C-alpha cells in the first residue's frame, strides 16, 4: 500500500476516502481456502453469516435462522444470497504473516496521530453473494475496507452530521452497543458513494453510518479495524451520561465541556476499578488480540 496524496495522515478518522492496495487476486482468499479457514476455527470468531434478501434499512438478525453451516455457506455463496464475516483472521497461522503486517503498515502510513491512539487491531474477511446488500449501520472503530475480488458500491455518510445521528442516538450506540442505525427518511442519498473494483479500498471513520451494495459477482474484502483509546474514553463518557440520565439529570454530550469530561472519566474509572475488585464483569474481547509493536 502507498499514500502518494497523503490522505491517510490528513483524513484518517476525519473523512472517508479511497485508496489502492496490492491484494487483489491473492490466492489466500479463494473460496476453498476461506471455507477451510472456517472449518479450522481456532482463536477466530465469533463469525457472522446470514442468508436471504435484506434491504438497506434491514437488521443484522435477518437471515440468521435456517441458514447453512458456515463452510457450506462460503462454498455456495455465489448462489445463496448470503453475507459472511470471518473475524480475527489475523490470528490464523496461515493468514497471520500477511494480515499482521497489513495492520502495522496501515498504522505506519497514517502516522503518529493514529499510532499513539491504537490499543489493538483486527482483520475480518467479508464475503458477499452477487447483488447482496449490507444494511445501513455504524461501527465505533475506524476501518479500512480492502476489496480483493468482485465489485461493489459502498455509501458512507458524514460521521459528524448530528442531523443524521443525534447526540442521544450516539449515546445509545456507545452505551448499549446498538450497532444498527436508523436512516432518516429521505436521507439515504446523502452519502459519499464509492464504486470499488478489486484492488481498491475505502476508509470509513468511526461512527460514520454506511451501507453497501454488491454487484454481479461474489465479492471478497478485508475489513481492517482498530480499537482506539480515544473511542474507549468516548464509550466510557456515554455510559456515564446514561447513568446520570437514569438519575434524572441532563448531562452534556462528550466534547461540550472538556473539564466535565475529565471529571466523568475519573469517576467512571474509579467506579469500574471498585467493581472489578469486587468481582464485577470484565469487558473486552476474549482470546488472542493483535497489539501494535512498541
Locate each region found by the language model.
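Catalytic core of Fe(II)/2-oxoglutarate
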Residues: 185-244
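Double-stranded beta-helix
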Residues: 149-203, 208-209
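N-terminal accessory scaffold of Fe(II)-dependent oxygenases
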Residues: 1-174, 221, 227, 231-294
Amino acid at each position: 500500500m502507498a499514500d502518494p496524496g497523503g490522505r491517510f495522515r490528513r483524513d484518517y478518522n476525519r473523512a472517508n476516502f479511497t485508496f489502492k492496495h496490492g491484494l487483489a487476486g491473492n490466492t489466500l482468499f479463494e473460496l476453498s481456502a476461506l471455507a477451510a479457514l472456517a472449518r479450522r476455527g481456532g482463536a477466530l470468531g465469533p463469525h457472522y453469516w446470514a442468508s436471504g434478501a435484506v434491504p438497506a434499512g434491514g437488521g443484522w438478525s435477518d437471515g440468521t435462522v435456517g441458514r447453512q453451516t458456515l463452510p457450506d455457506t462460503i462454498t455456495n455463496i455465489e448462489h445463496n444470497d448470503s453475507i459472511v464475516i470471518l473475524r480475527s483472521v489475523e490470528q490464523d497461522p496461515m493468514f497471520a504473516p500477511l494480515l499482521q503486517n497489513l495492520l502495522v503498515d496501515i498504522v505506519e502510513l497514517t502516522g503518529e496521530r493514529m499510532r499513539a491512539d491504537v490499543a489493538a487491531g483486527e482483520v475480518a474477511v467479508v464475503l458477499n453473494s452477487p447483488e447482496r446488500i449490507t444494511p445501513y449501520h455504524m461501527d465505533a472503530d475506524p476501518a479500512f475496507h480492502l476489496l480483493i475480488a468482485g465489485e461493489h458500491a459502498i455509501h458512507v455518510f458524514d460521521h459528524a452530521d448530528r442531523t443524521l445521528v443525534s447526540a442521544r442516538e450516539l449515546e445509545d450506540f456507545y452505551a448499549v452497543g446498538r450497532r444498527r442505525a436508523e436512516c432518516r427518511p429521505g436521507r439515504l442519498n446523502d452519502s459519499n458513494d464509492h464504486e470499488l473494483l478489486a484492488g481498491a479500498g475505502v476508509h470509513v471513520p468511526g461512527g460514520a453510518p454506511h451501507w453497501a451494495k454488491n454487484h454481479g459477482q461474489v465479492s471478497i474484502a478485508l475489513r481492517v479495524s482498530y480499537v482506539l483509546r480515544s473511542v474507549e474514553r468516548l464509550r466510557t463518557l456515554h455510559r456515564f451520561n446514561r447513568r446520570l440520565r437514569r438519575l434524572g439529570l441532563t448531562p452534556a454530550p462528550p466534547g461540550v465541556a472538556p473539564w466535565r469530561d475529565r471529571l466523568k472519566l475519573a469517576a467512571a474509572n474509579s467506579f469500574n476499578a471498585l467493581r472489578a475488585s469486587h468481582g464485577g464483569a470484565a469487558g473486552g474481547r476474549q482470546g488472542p488480540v493483535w497489539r501494535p509493536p512498541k
